[in-house]
Regions:
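Extended polysaccharide-engagement surfaces of secreted carbohydrate-active enzymes
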Residues: 3-326
Length: 327
């Protein structure tokens, strides 16, 4: 039984959270604040050992090893999979073309930790954080330059100072409604977000519907009494060297460097991922260099300033929104 559990964990959980050789950032805990932490190529050794212990699935391990060693593309022999980990309020959706996950928190689970002087800006990561990756390296070492008020997937006020949870370890969530359903291939996740801690004073009803070639992200009941404008960030990832395309009123344009605001564009295309806005909305788009140091998020790391070219996209709900929505 223990051997079967180990096999299932390694094949259907651990390695599913790695795209190519890069692990999804929101399953790394406070390790996210350490340089090169997402590169898991060294875990090819684990897969080699599992191939000996679990010969029934040797072909799966061979494919995993090939991806980890860059001998094959990130999508090599990946099969559709959808899992909701109800004990952890976490959802993982895998397709050959992409991987997408959602992290939430409830009264049953704990917020992201920031112990030992690590992960010092992590506060909003527990609140509907998402990854969307095709190659796996879309967020590699972006974190010192990240705007941590705009973590992908989250709806959050753009506070001057990012809060720190009440405790560096084991701070329980406050939502009583966070969960999902899955048939192992498709699924739905939902999160009733409400946070009155440290001036956040913001709530939203958030849901994700998972299909083959698309993920539908919906938000409603977005309310806030915070002094700061509330943003729902769709993505904040490394900027691809190809053009960013935007369509508005069916007119396609190429986006230059800078910060921009649009009223109800049709869609945005960046790095092979399309973002469609069926209900419009006030959209912000940033396409520029961002700076920061590893020390800003981890006091054991270097104070040397880092520069990253970053793409950010999301909804601007304004200040004190009442029953705002997004799709």
């Amino acid at each position: 039984i223990r051997d079967r559990l180990l096999s299932k964990f390694m094949r259907q959980t651990y390695y599913q959270a790695i795209r190519g050789k890069y692990m999804l950032f929101d399953v790394l805990g406070r390790g996210i604040s350490r340089k090169d932490i997402t590169d898991k190529s060294a875990t090819a050794l684990f897969a080699e050992r599992m191939a000996v212990l679990d010969p029934e699935h040797i072909e799966e391990y061979k494919a995993i090893i090939a991806r980890l060693k860059d001998e094959q593309a990130a999508d090599y022999k990946l099969k559709p999979l959808h899992t909701h980990y109800f004990r952890g309020d976490y959802t993982l959706h895998v397709r050959p073309g992409y991987t997408f996950d959602v992290r939430t928190v409830s009264t049953r689970t704990m917020r992201c930790e920031y112990g030992n002087g690590e992960n010092l800006k992590t506060y909003f990561m527990s609140d509907g954080c998402t990854n969307i990756v095709t190659q796996g390296n879309e967020y590699t070492n972006i974190f010192p330059a990240w705007n941590w008020r705009r973590i992908p997937g989250t709806t959050a006020p753009q506070l001057d100072t990012i809060p720190m949870a009440a405790s560096d370890w084991q701070t329980r969530g406050t939502s009583t409604f966070a969960g999902g359903v899955s048939d192992s291939i498709y699924g739905v996740s939902a999160y009733a977000y409400m946070d009155n801690y440290a001036g956040v004073n913001t709530g939203a009803k958030k849901a994700w519907f998972f299909f083959d070639n698309e993920v539908v992200c919906l938000g409603s009941g977005i309310n806030s009494t915070s002094y700061a404008p509330v943003y729902t960030t769709i993505n904040q990832c490394l900027l691809d060297d190809k053009n960013i395309l935007l369509s508005q009123n069916k007119q396609q344009t190429t986006i230059k460097k800078g910060e921009f605001s649009y009223d109800s564009p049709d869609w945005v295309l960046h790095n092979g991922i399309g973002y469609i806005f069926p209900q419009g909305g006030r959209i912000f788009l940033c396409n520029q260099q961002q700076t920061g140091s590893w020390y800003d998020i981890n006091h054991t790391e270097s104070k040397e300033m880092q520069q990253r070219e970053v793409f950010t996209l999301g909804f601007n709900h304004g200040t004190n929104p009442r029953n705002a929505t997004y799709a």
